[in-house]
Amino acid sequence: DEIFNLAELPHSMVVIGAGVVGIEYASMFALMGVEVTMVDTRERPLEFLDREIIDELVHQMRDIKVVFRLGETVAKVETRENARRRVVVSLESGKRLIADVALVCAGRAGNTHSLNLGAAGLEADERGRLTVNDKFRTQQSHIYAGGDVIGFPALAATSSEQGRLAACNAFGVEVGPMPTNFPVGIYSIPEISMVGEAEHELTARKIPYEVGIARF
């Protein structure tokens, strides 16, 4: 979130992490003329999406000059004083990426470190996340949680629904469980949305399906 504090648009940027947030920011900054390089340990970004959609997204991002360094691990990040390009990102493969800024998109962490959870009988994991049951109740029967603080998928649409269900359960309002198939919205350019399982997941589970394609 510190990216919003930039005083001016950088000339170049290294984005570490090709997840949802990384892809969103990379495409936005690239369209504003920033030289963007993405680094991720995985061979394919956004692996939970249909591969055909991912391939098309990567193709379009390359068209706006985004460079992908996939299957690469960051060894260290250093800053240089009084240099025009102030950040050096060294990869374990020996490559060095030099840019004005580096944006680390390593997933959302729960903002719970200052809440003194122990006083309420709660304990967060190393990323500040709480454990809840299917009704979003924590270890304490009178405390409920939803959204980024309980982990995956940590998206706006799902967090809103989790919050609604948690509030209903807390006040004894009868509601059903969280839907198994929830909508996913990714605000990249172009935008991506999906609901349900991806094609490769259905194939792995030997579930018959049909494919329809509409281009627009």
Stretch-by-stretch model annotation:
Residues T41, T73-V74, L115, R129, ...:
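Proline- and acidic/polar-enriched loop/turn elements at helix boundaries
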Residues E43, L103-R108, D148, P183-P190, ...:
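Glycine-rich beta-alpha junction loops
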Residues V67-R69, Y144, E210-G212:
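General small-molecule cofactor/ligand-binding pocket signal
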Residues D1-P10, R96-F171:
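FAD-site-proximal beta/loop scaffold in flavoenzymes
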Residues F4-N5, P10-V14, V20-V88, S93, ...:
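Rossmann-like dinucleotide-binding cores of NAD(P)H-dependent redox enzymes
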Residues D1, L70-E72, E78, E126, ...:
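Short loop/edge segments at beta-strand edges and connector loops
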Residues S193-F216:
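Structured beta-strand/loop patches that form or line metal/cofactor-binding pockets in enzymes
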